[in-house]
Design a protein with these regions (language model features):
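Active-/binding-site microenvironments in catalytic and ligand-binding cores
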Residues: 1-230
């Protein structure tokens, strides 16, 4: 068995959308501060974290993209959503700033030699992190799903899909439409994944990516992991 870490590190001022709160990490306590109790010395180091619920590798709750009363918050989502069978589709040939079409997904599924099943997690490897991490294009240049290709995934009955980018659709209308497809067809998505190249050609595997139990949360950072039975 091999575990593949699919989460990127959360760090101070990491890149993200201006519509989400920035990540601010500062030192709160250091080992320079020594306390004593009954002649016994002790020190501790701690950090202060301020960030939005969409920081880093995260999963969206329906409340994020569904304004209707009763849309689930992250703490209300079933844990089974985040512990599933999974597949990875290779879309690394797609140019930056391009649309992912239905045909792209069909061809990638065929090339993977697997069939997407209901409740699956579908991970979409676009080789975006390697190509754009650390550049201004990280927040603008990613390939993205369209309303039509997201609908194709949703009609497969999947539980969620995941991308390396900070958004599932291209910036602007396409991104809004993909979010609303998730709303209308009852599934969700993850953003900010890494190391998806290690899953290409691996067939079916176990995905684990539990969110924090944030009351009324619209999303949550996750530690996403693929479990490969080598």
């Amino acid at each position: 068995m091999r575990l593949v870490d699919l989460s990127r590190e959360i760090h101070h001022r990491m890149p993200g959308f201006a519509t989400h709160a920035p990540v601010i990490i500062t030192t709160y306590g250091t080992h320079d501060e020594v306390r004593e109790a009954d002649g016994y010395a002790f020190s501790s180091a701690t950090l202060s974290l301020s960030m939005g619920d969409h920081a880093g590798t995260h999963v969206d709750a329906p409340r994020h993209f569904d304004a209707r009363p009763g849309a689930s918050t992250i703490d209300e989502m079933p844990l089974e959503t985040f512990y599933t069978e999974a597949v990875c589709l290779d879309l690394s040939h797609k140019p930056l700033k391009s649309d992912i079409s239905i045909d792209d997904l069909v061809q990638a599924e065929r090339a993977a030699g697997i069939a997407i099943k209901p409740k699956d997690t579908v991970l979409l490897h676009m080789d975006f992190y390697r190509r754009c991490h650390g550049t201004p294009g990280y927040v603008t240049d990613f390939p993205g799903l369209t309303k039509e290709s997201a609908t194709w995934l949703g009609k497969k009955g999947i539980g969620m899909f995941g991308v390396e980018a900070i958004s599932p659709g291209r910036p602007g209308r396409a991104n809004y439409e993909v979010h609303h497809v998730c709303r209308d067809l009852g599934f969700t998505h993850m953003e900010g994944l890494v190391n998806l190249d290690q899953l290409v050609g691996k067939g079916r595997f176990r995905f684990i990516g539990f969110p924090l139990k944030i009351k009324d949360g619209t999303a949550s950072p996750i530690r996403a992991v693929a479990v490969l039975e080598d």
